[in-house]
Amino acid sequence: MKTLTLISLIMVTLLSGCSPISREQVRPGDPAFAPVPPQTLMQPAPVDGSIYSSAQNFSLFGDRTAHQVGDVLTVVLQESTQSSKSTGTSMKKDSENSFNEATILGTAISAHNLSLLTDQNFERDFSGEADADQSNSLSGSISVTISDVLPNGVLRIRGEKWLTLTEGDEYLRVSGLVRPQDIGVDNTILSSKIADARFAYSGAGAFGDVNRAGWLQRFFNSEWFPL
């Protein structure tokens, strides 16, 4: 009984050690996706006796699209990917060995009137086949802010959107690099024009946990399981 208990404890310890590390809990307000406030500019001194004030000017012909740190930009998500892969492997190996009948001084050796003539045949077969199909689509829109302006004029953007549900949360996170000339007159940009794009759409709380396999099932599906 003690031996069985000890074996059970060892197996539980090994399974716990082989289970994948749990993912870090995702929470809103991550500094990596937080909005960046605009840069503070020195306000010019007011000029007395003048109708025009440079502190409150508004250009009728200037570019009103996002181009500075802290400006808001709308990303239109139009992502669609599809992949298909099929592999097949087949191996076969046959071998045959024959041993002549043993003799001593020309007389065949036998045991219980049975000849010692031996033939050995070996045959090994292996076949494997795998098919994988995957498709993903993401559509919608999200407003992000410009977090940095690179020396070449490229804009670095980032932002997140959270939707609180009854049993958890859904979140969407976006980051990447944008060229100012790709921004439309309505201050929007297509997701396909974002370089080094990072899109994350998932769930947190009970909503995300229900779609995730337990640690024991993940162990049987991992490389640690020998079968």
UniProtKB/Swiss-Prot annotation:
Key word Signal present: yes
One Pfam family hit: FlgH
Cellular compartments annotated: Cell outer membrane; Bacterial flagellum basal body
Membrane topology: Lipid-anchor
GO biological process: bacterial-type flagellum-dependent cell motility
GO molecular function, one term: cytoskeletal motor activity
Signal sequence extent: 1-17
InterPro entries in UniProt: Flag_Lring
Residue positions bearing lipid (N-palmitoyl cysteine): C18
GO CC terms in record: bacterial-type flagellum basal body, distal rod, L ring; cell outer membrane
Residue numbers with lipid attached (S-diacylglycerol cysteine): C18
Residues passing through the membrane, by range: none
Keywords assigned by UniProt, alphabetized: Bacterial flagellum, Cell outer membrane, Lipoprotein, Membrane, Palmitate, Signal
Protein's job: Assembles around the rod to form the L-ring and probably protects the motor/basal body from shearing forces during rotation.
Family per record: Belongs to the FlgH family.
Subunit annotation: The basal body constitutes a major portion of the flagellar organelle and consists of four rings (L,P,S, and M) mounted on a central rod.
Protein name (database record): Flagellar L-ring protein
Lineage: Bacteria, Pseudomonadati, Pseudomonadota, Gammaproteobacteria, Oceanospirillales
